[in-house]
Amino acid sequence: MQDNDVIRALIIGDIIGDGGLKKIFFNLKSLKEKYNIDLAIVNGENSSGGFGITPEIAENLFKAGVNVITTGNHVYAESSIREYLDKQEYILRPNNFSDLLEGHGYCILNVKNEKVAVINIQGFLGMTFIVKNPFENIKKVVNMIRNKVKTIFVDFHAESNYEKESFGYFLNGLVTGVVGTHTHIMTQDERILDKGTAYISDLGMTGSLNSVIGFNPEISLKGLLEYVALRTETVEDDVIIQGVVITSHLKTGRALKIERIQK
């Protein structure tokens, strides 16, 4: 199949702190060139010191070549982001959050003269943030846009792989790809489901290999041993980028290939 017939989307796992940001800033351009990327999506909810995102960080990510920023339960950790979420079309918060909260949960953009949608949804199993039922919510959005958009990517920010896999099969044949985020641990279950939807339980993270999900191992261990919640810190060395490249048919939105990447 010719390049003109496909869309290649690079979707990157949760960016952790300054180390993760620097890794993106220095490597995104070369990654896009290597894989001939048409659309770059990153989860940015941990980019500000490990918790939240600021307008300045978001703008710098866009300048670096990111097209869409997704988030999750930490999106409001930085108060400065609230107003920005209403102004910037291409930064998302989970669509199934309360309607009273700032921001929006999906966007539509043009890629190769075709409309492409990115939807951000949060799970509810094992999550403390109260959300609307993700299955009911995503179905409403997909039904609303499906007649005008064939290529749809979903960031499902959730704790439970049971819920994530169920979500993938729920959307099988309705969307191009379902990628899990939140745990910061990359899974090796990437595949194309039988009705043409690309799936992976978790993208992993853009964070340090010498860490506990991007954070200081000593502090994490101390908290577990002493049964207390401690203020943690990100680890900035040996940072890797984890994610996937999904190749899909330009006209039908059907996924053709999903490939894990780690750089």
Q: At which residue positions do the language-model features occur?
A:
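Acidic, metal/ion-coordinating pockets
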Residues: M1-K263
